[in-house]
């Protein structure tokens, strides 16, 4: 390398200047339209074709309906009926969990699936209510309004919270701000969902033990205290019946997991439990007074509820808070589920379009007596395994639910509440993903800490504390990643021009007169002081080592900036300050491999003038060769004679 001639060094070019508005437009396009959603429309010359493509983009049903076949219809009908058999008992159960009338669970499986079938981009997502959002609704609304004492206000606030959730989801999608939801890391979601599932299971002990009075708190200590303080109120009939159905449900889940072709056994088991539980109690309710049942469910499809929305103080802020928090959680779950099944079938879904679809189905749902819905994993997994081809399976499910609402609701009168509790517990146990937690422990201890913190926050605190911990630790992790970028010493891989981390490649060769440091991240206000201090420490350690070994003293500090995607004014000030500090120590700063954005910023400052263009190189290899040239043929201050432009 040292024999490389000066004329072979390449000068790092400064990117041509761009008008501010054009630069701003490009930046916004990268942030908001990274997937270039209007590419097909932009490349079309005919106005009518552009309108058609635009409508197909907004309403995906127009896209998949064009090639729809009888074979697809057969698959979607089977899938729709299958998920309806799961949606009906789950809907009733989750409405109970949210402290809402059971009929709302059926209402929420009618309108939202129809809206999603028109606007949703996932072929496999099955829309409905979910346990975590139901529990959040109950926990947050229940703090201010008692569902038993003031059921009408509680119901109206649930509709209003659903409206605000839908409005927030729609706005995020329209403004292309989907990345906001991604602030929750995978580890945080695993911990939060696991904690919420644990809390839901604990809450269901009320139904399993036949208790009439129960705590509104969700932390494990208060719940267990409430359970054992009422041990004299436990109903053995309820407990035995609940355990029998729970064992049945878990057995069918185990069979379906071991033999995926028998997925329908697990899918049908909740409905089978409801049917057998209802028949059992219908004939034996006189003998088993301790078993509570649903009672009357009103016949008919969804009544309008737009006039019931509450937009007046003091409750509007409560509904807004509940709507935003539950909406974000539901959105994160729905998009994650949709993407996972899209990956299995090798197609893509548009996250921003999904947000708009979720938002519209919740807005319209709030107008038609529905509470918050999203794409639950259990229902979507059944839909996927049943062989669905398009979102029409949601329409079939909605039709089946409508038939139930119009003609079959009286049949649920004697459905035992303990059966609904068993259905919820069986569904929630699958959300405690211990395998994912073990994987996090093996892969990344910090991610495991994030997961554990979120879990413990929910279980021993409240849902809100768990959510705050999940977001807070995720943000802290993000700040640590960017605010404390890695800096490591690089060495030369023998007989090559490749330079790598010497800790990763111990055989890499270092030079006594050169210290090559790689900065692994952007340089900006949050990390500039840290980088300056850390670089200073590396230099001190290197000089101490050279002093001890008696080698040639340190002459050049080469900063490899290949991973520095951007730099701000604080970062530039740090480089200028570092150059002055090194100058006082008779050391020379050399920059290698700066990116276009970095060079553009540096060219507008005084840094290049102060350091000199002759100390900025295209690659680390050329920077090292130039330093060798100056060390062996000239004084350290001497510039490299010539550069070739690239």
Curated annotation (Swiss-Prot):
Tissue: Expressed only in leaves.
GO molecular function: secondary active sulfate transmembrane transporter activity; symporter activity
Compartmental location: Membrane
Domain STAS: 504-627
Main location as per UniProt: membrane
TM segment ranges: 77-97, 100-120, 125-145, 155-175, 177-197, 236-256, 263-283, 316-336, 355-375, 391-411, 412-432, 448-468
Keyword Phosphoprotein part of the UniProt annotation: no
Cited PROSITE patterns: SLC26A, STAS
Keyword Transmembrane helix: yes
Function: H(+)/sulfate cotransporter that may play a role in the regulation of sulfate assimilation.
NCBIfam families for this protein: sulP
Protein name as annotated: Sulfate transporter 3.2
Primary gene name: SULTR3;2
């Amino acid at each position: 390398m040292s024999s490389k001639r000066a004329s072979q060094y390449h000068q790092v070019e400064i990117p041509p200047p761009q008008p501010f508005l054009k630069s701003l437009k490009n930046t916004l396009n990268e942030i908001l339209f990274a997937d270039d959603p209007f590419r097909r429309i932009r490349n079309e010359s005919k106005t009518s074709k552009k309108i058609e493509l635009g409508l197909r983009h907004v309403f995906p049903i127009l896209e998949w309906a064009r090639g729809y076949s009888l074979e697809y219809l057969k698959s979607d009908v089977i899938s729709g009926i299958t998920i309806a058999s799961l949606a009906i008992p789950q809907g009733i159960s989750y409405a109970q969990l949210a402290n809402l009338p059971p009929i709302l669970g059926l209402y929420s499986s009618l309108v939202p699936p129809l809206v999603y079938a028109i606007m949703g981009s996932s072929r496999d997502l099955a829309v409905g209510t979910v346990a975590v959002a139901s529990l959040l609704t109950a926990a947050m609304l229940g703090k201010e309004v008692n569902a038993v004492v003031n059921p009408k206000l509680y119901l109206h606030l649930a509709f209003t919270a659903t409206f605000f959730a839908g409005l927030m989801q729609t706005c995020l999608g329209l403004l292309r701000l989907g990345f906001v939801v991604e602030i929750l890391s995978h580890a945080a979601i695993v911990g939060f969902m696991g904690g919420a599932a644990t809390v839901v299971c604990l809450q269901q002990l009320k139904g399993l033990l036949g208790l009439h009075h129960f705590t509104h708190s969700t932390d494990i200590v208060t719940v267990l205290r409430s359970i054992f303080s009422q041990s004299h109120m436990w109903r053995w009939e309820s407990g035995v019946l609940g355990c029998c159905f729970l064992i049945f449900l878990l057995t069918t889940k185990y069979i379906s997991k071991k033999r995926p072709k028998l997925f329908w056994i697990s899918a049908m088991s909740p409905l089978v439990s409801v049917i057998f539980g209802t028949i059992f109690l219908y004939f034996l309710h006189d003998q088993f007074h301790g078993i509570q049942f649903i009672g009357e469910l009103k016949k008919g499809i969804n009544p309008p509820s737009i006039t019931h929305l509450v937009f007046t103080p003091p409750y509007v802020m409560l509904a807004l808070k509940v709507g935003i928090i539950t909406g974000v959680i539901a959105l994160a779950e729905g998009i994650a589920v949709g993407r996972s099944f899209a990956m299995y079938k090798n197609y893509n879904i548009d996250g921003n379009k999904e947000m708009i679809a979720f938002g519209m189905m919740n807005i319209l749902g709030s107008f038609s007596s529905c509470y918050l819905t999203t794409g639950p994993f259990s229902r979507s997994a059944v839909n996927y395994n049943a062989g669905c081809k398009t979102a029409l399976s949601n329409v079939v499910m909605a039709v089946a639910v409508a038939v139930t609402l119009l003609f079959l609701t009286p049949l649920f009168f004697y459905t035992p509440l303990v059966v609904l509790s068993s259905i919820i517990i069986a569904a929630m146990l699958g959300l405690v993903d211990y395998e994912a937690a073990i994987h996090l422990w093996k892969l990344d201890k910090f991610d495991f800490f994030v997961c554990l913190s979120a879990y413990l926050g929910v279980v021993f605190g409240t849902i809100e504390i768990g959510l705050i911990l999940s977001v807070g630790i995720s943000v802290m992790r993000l700040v640590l990643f960017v605010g404390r970028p890695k800096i490591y010493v690089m060495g030369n891989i023998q007989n090559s021009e490749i330079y790598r981390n010497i800790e990763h490649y111990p055989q890499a060769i270092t030079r006594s007169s050169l210290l090559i440091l790689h900065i692994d991240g952007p340089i900006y206000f949050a990390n500039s002081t840290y980088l300056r201090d850390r670089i200073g420490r590396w230099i001190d350690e290197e000089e101490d080592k050279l002093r001890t070994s008696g080698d040639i003293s340190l002459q050049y500090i080469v900063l490899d900036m290949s991973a520095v995607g951007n730099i701000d004014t604080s970062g530039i000030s740090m480089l200028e300050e570092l150059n002055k500090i090194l100058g006082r120590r008779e050391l020379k700063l050399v920059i290698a491999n700066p990116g276009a954005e970095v060079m553009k910023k540096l060219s507008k400052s005084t840094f290049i003038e102060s350091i000199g263009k002759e100390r900025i190189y295209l690659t680390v290899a050329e920077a090292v060769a130039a330093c060798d040239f100056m060390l062996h043929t000239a004084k350290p201050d001497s510039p490299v004679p010539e550069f070739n432009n690239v």
